[in-house]
Amino acid sequence: MAFKVVVSQKEVTHQIEVEDGKALNGLVIGDEFDGGIVGLDGYTLKVTGGADKNGFTMKKDVPGTRRIKSLLSGGIGYHPKSDGVKRRKTVRGNTIADDIVQVNTVVVSAGSKAIADILGVGDEEEEE
């Protein structure tokens, strides 16, 4: 199953479609991996979160790949309108599995080429 890897770098965010997601299975939020897995040779990326096929966000303090209903007072998965409000919301565990369709990452160390050059983004604007 194809999934999306969102790579954030300072002010710019790029989205990469990856066909083979098996290489990222088992990574936990906070783990670093080689960007060559997603086509960014020379880059080191850090997993910061993600979402599963039903849109439930990954939460760092929920171990494993399971989906639970957690009582939240704010933070990832729930943003109350007033202070002190708690609500039970469904969140996903912190480990990447087959059900995850979006993985959010941040650049830890950059490669020699810019991400836009590797992906070919921005070429359409220059041609027009």
From Swiss-Prot:
Coiled-coil boundaries: none
InterPro entries in the cross-refs: Ribosomal_eS6, Ribosomal_eS6_arc
Classification via SMART domains: Ribosomal_S6e (SM01405)
GO terms of biological process kind: translation
Keywords carried by this UniProt record: Ribonucleoprotein, Ribosomal protein
GO cellular component, one term: ribonucleoprotein complex
Molecular function per GO: structural constituent of ribosome
Keyword Secreted: no
Listed PANTHER family: 40S RIBOSOMAL PROTEIN S6
Similarity remark: Belongs to the eukaryotic ribosomal protein eS6 family.
Stated name of the protein: Small ribosomal subunit protein eS6
Naturally occurring in which organism (per UniProt): Methanobrevibacter smithii (strain ATCC 35061 / DSM 861 / OCM 144 / PS)
Gene designation: rps6e
